[in-house]
UniProtKB/Swiss-Prot annotation:
Its EC number is 2.7.1.71. The keyword Iron does not apply. InterPro entries: P-loop_NTPase, Shikimate/glucono_kinase, Shikimate_kinase/TSH1, Shikimate_kinase_CS. Substrate binds at D37, R61, G83, R140. It comes from Psychrobacter arcticus (strain DSM 17307 / VKM B-2377 / 273-4). ATP binds at G15, A16, G17, K18, T19, T20, R121. This is Shikimate kinase. One of its GO terms (cellular component) is cytosol. The keyword Nucleotide-binding applies.
Amino acid sequence: MVEELPSVFLVGPMGAGKTTIGRLLAKQLGRTFVDSDWYVESQTGADIAWIFDKEGEAGFRERETRAIDELTQQPQIVLATGGGAVMAAENREFLKQRGIVIYLNAPVDVQMARTAKDKSRPLLQQPNPRKILQGLYSARDPLYRQVAHIIMPTGHTYPRHMVNQLLQQLNSFCASTSVVSEPEKD
């Protein structure tokens, strides 16, 4: 059943494990893994912190939307999106309509533990990162849930075990819906 899956898109807050789980899931599915943040960096030749510094968050979000539009049209990939990708209605539509969306739901304590020393996250370079993470979680959680086909809690199991659970959920999801492979493009 897994061979028939369309692309799989991972959403969730920073520190949820989208990149780690995405890589492992792609390997299990025999698919290409793409991280939308890395894609934006490769397209601009600059890191996200620089883009935020020079263009602000709005400039980065415009680039991110273009990237998500392009990436969600690629057949049978596993895509890890940036934590804020769901803020744009356009991105939510691309994700929901073009593949299976998995929300990796990490509590704020897990996010703090995983991002505490990461200086590459511009939104956390503030005096109170916990407050920032809590605010982001409160604002974004309903949007992650709105776009998700599958919700997977993170932070309490090993990544490989989580990927095995996701494969089971993907099989169940496909069996219970009319999900088929993406049509060939003309």
